[in-house]
Curated annotation (Swiss-Prot):
Residues 319-330 have a biased composition (Basic residues). Residues 15-25, 195-209 have a biased composition (Polar residues). Residues 179-194 have a biased composition (Acidic residues). It comes from the Eukaryota. Residues 1-40, 72-92, 133-158, 173-209, 306-347 are annotated as: Disordered. PANTHER family: CHROMOSOME 12 OPEN READING FRAME 71 (PTHR36462:SF1). It holds the Pfam family DUF4640. This is Uncharacterized protein C12orf71 homolog.
Length: 347
C-alpha cells in the first residue's frame, strides 16, 4: 500500500527529490508519513496547472484573478468589506504578485459600494417620477422634510381658511335674507288682504265715474259713489230708490216725471242678501243703470232740448213737409183750364 500511494506522487517529480518513508507494518496505514520539501510542492502545483491548461484551455493567471473577483464580490456583499476570501493554496505559496492582488482587491472592495449607490439613486429617481406626492408625503412623515417649505404650507392653510370663512359668510347672509323675507311677507300679505275688499268696490265706482263723467252735473252724484262700502247694507234698497227718484225729479222738473214711475223703472232689491260684497256689487250695478238712464235726460235739460229720440224724428217730419209744399206749388191741369191756358197737343 505504501508503494502504491507513493507512485503518483513520484510521477511528476524531477530527479533529486527525497521521499522518506517509515513503515513499521505494511498493513498499517496510519503510520505513513510524507515530508515534502518546497521544491516538491512547487513542482506538484506547476504540473497540475499545466495539465489543466492543456486539457481545458485553462490559464493560471486568469484563474486566480477571476476566482478572486467572483469570490471577493460575493463575500463582500454578504459578509461586509472586512471579510475577504483568499484561496488557501494560493495564499500559502503565491507571494510574488501580492502587491498586484492587494490592489485588485482594493478596487473590488470599492466597486460594490458604488454599485449599491447607483442602484439606490436609480430606484429613488423612479419613485419620484412615478408619484411625487407620495414621496413628498413620506418624506414629511419621516421628518426629513420638515422645514424645507414653510411658506408654501402656510399659504395653503391660509387659502383654506379664507375659503371656509367665505362659505360661512354666504351661509349667514342667506339665513338673514330668508328671515327678512319671512318677516316682511306676512305684513304685506295682511295689508293686501285688508286692502282688497275696501279697494274693489270704490274702484268699480271710479270706473263708472270715468265712463259717465263727461257732463259737469254728474259731479253732484259723486259723493254717492265715494261713500264707504259698509254704509250700503245699513240703508234699505227701497229707500235708496226713493232718494234717487227724488234727485232725478229735481233734475228733470220740466218734464214732470213722477217718483212712482222712476221707482217702478228702477230694479228691485234682491230677495236674499248673502254677504256684504254681493250687496255692494248689486248697488254698483244699480248706479250704473241709473247713470245710463240719467245721462241723456240731463243733457237735454241743460241744453233746452227734448228727448234725443224726438230730436231725431223732427228732421224726418220737416223733410216730409217740404216735399208736400213742393208738390202743392206745382200747377195742376184743372187749374190750367180754369185760368184759360191752352194745353199743347200731344203728338
Amino acid at each position: 500500500m505504501a508503494q502504491e500511494l507513493a507512485a503518483p506522487l513520484s510521477c511528476g517529480q524531477p530527479p533529486g527529490q527525497n521521499i522518506t518513508e517509515t513503515t513499521t507494518d505494511p498493513w498499517d496505514e496510519g503510520d505513513l508519513r510524507f515530508e515534502p520539501s518546497n521544491s516538491m510542492v512547487h513542482s506538484f502545483s506547476s504540473s497540475s496547472e499545466s495539465n489543466l491548461s492543456l486539457s481545458v484551455g485553462y490559464f493560471p493567471c486568469e484563474d486566480t484573478l477571476s476566482c478572486e473577483d467572483t469570490l471577493s464580490c460575493e463575500d463582500s456583499s454578504s459578509e461586509g468589506p472586512s471579510m475577504h476570501f483568499v484561496p488557501p493554496i494560493q495564499g500559502s505559496w503565491r507571494t510574488e504578485n501580492t502587491g498586484r492582488l492587494l490592489a485588485r482587491r482594493d478596487q473590488i472592495q470599492d466597486d460594490p459600494e458604488q454599485f449599491c449607490k447607483l442602484s439606490i439613486t436609480l430606484a429613488w429617481d423612479v419613485d419620484m417620477a412615478s408619484n411625487n406626492s407620495d414621496s413628498t408625503t413620506n418624506c414629511d412623515l419621516s421628518g426629513d422634510n420638515k422645514d424645507k417649505h414653510p411658506k408654501e404650507k402656510t399659504q395653503l392653510t391660509l387659502s383654506k381658511l379664507d375659503g371656509l370663512v367665505q362659505k360661512l359668510e354666504k351661509f349667514l347672509e342667506n339665513q338673514k335674507d330668508d328671515k327678512d323675507d319671512d318677516s316682511v311677507f306676512p305684513e304685506s300679505a295682511q295689508e293686501e288682504d285688508s286692502q282688497l275688499p275696501s279697494s274693489s268696490l270704490p274702484g268699480m265706482a271710479q270706473v263708472s265715474h270715468q265712463e259717465y263723467g263727461s257732463c259737469q252735473d254728474l259731479a253732484k252724484f259723486n259723493p254717492l259713489e265715494n261713500e264707504d262700502v259698509n254704509q250700503f247694507p245699513q240703508i234699505h234698497p227701497r229707500l235708496q230708490n226713493q232718494e234717487l227718484a227724488k234727485i232725478i225729479s229735481k233734475a228733470t222738473g220740466s218734464q214732470g216725471t213722477d217718483i212712482a214711475e222712476i221707482s217702478s223703472v228702477l230694479p228691485g232689491p234682491p230677495e236674499k242678501e248673502d254677504t256684504h260684497s254681493s250687496t255692494g256689487a248689486l248697488s254698483c250695478l244699480n248706479f250704473r243703470w241709473v247713470f245710463r238712464w240719467l245721462r241723456p235726460q240731463v243733457r237735454s235739460s241743460l241744453l233746452g232740448r227734448e228727448d234725443p229720440r224726438e230730436a231725431n224724428e223732427r228732421p224726418r217730419e220737416l223733410a216730409r213737409k217740404k216735399r208736400f209744399s213742393y208738390r202743392s206749388k206745382r200747377i195742376q191741369p184743372q187749374e190750367s183750364f180754369e185760368l184759360g191756358h191752352p194745353i199743347p197737343p200731344d203728338f
